[in-house]
Amino acid sequence: MTKLIFKIILIFTIFFSAEAKSKELGIGDVNSKVTIKVFSSLTCPACANFHSKIFYQIKEEFIDKGLVRFEHHPFPLDLAALNAEIIVRCHVDNSKKFELLGKIYEKQKLWAVGSDINKINNSIKKIGLESDLKNKDMDNCLKDENKQDEILNQRI
C-alpha cells in the first residue's frame, strides 16, 4: 500500500511540475545550476525598479553567459496587473514576452494609473501594439478565462 501511495504521489509530482514548467516565463539555459525565480506584480513600483535597474545587469553578466536561468512568475496584486500579464502572454515567443514585459515595466507610470480598468487596458494594449501584437488578439487573450486562471494559480 505504501508503494502504491508513493507511486501516485510521484506521478502527480511529475505531472504538475511538467505542467508548471510549460507555463513559466523564463530566459537563459534551462540546464543552469542556478535559477532565479522572481514573483512580481506588473503594477508594483519596486518590481519595475528591479526590472529596469537590476534585471538587465543580471542578464548581461549571468543569463547571457549561460550561468543563470531567470524566471518571471506572475503575482498580480490587482486587475490591472493581471490584465498586463495576460497581454504579455499573448506572445508565443518567449523572447518577445520578455521584451514586452520590459516595456510594460518601463512605462508603468503611464498605464498603471486611474480607476477605470478599460482605460488602463487600452494603455496596456498600446504597449502591446508596439510589440507587434494585434488588438483582436489582445482582446481575445483578455477574455480567455483559462489564461486568467493560469496566471492566478501560479500565485498559490
Task: Describe the residue ranges of each PLM region.
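Extracytoplasmic thiol/disulfide redox context detector
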Residues: 1-78, 82, 125, 147-156
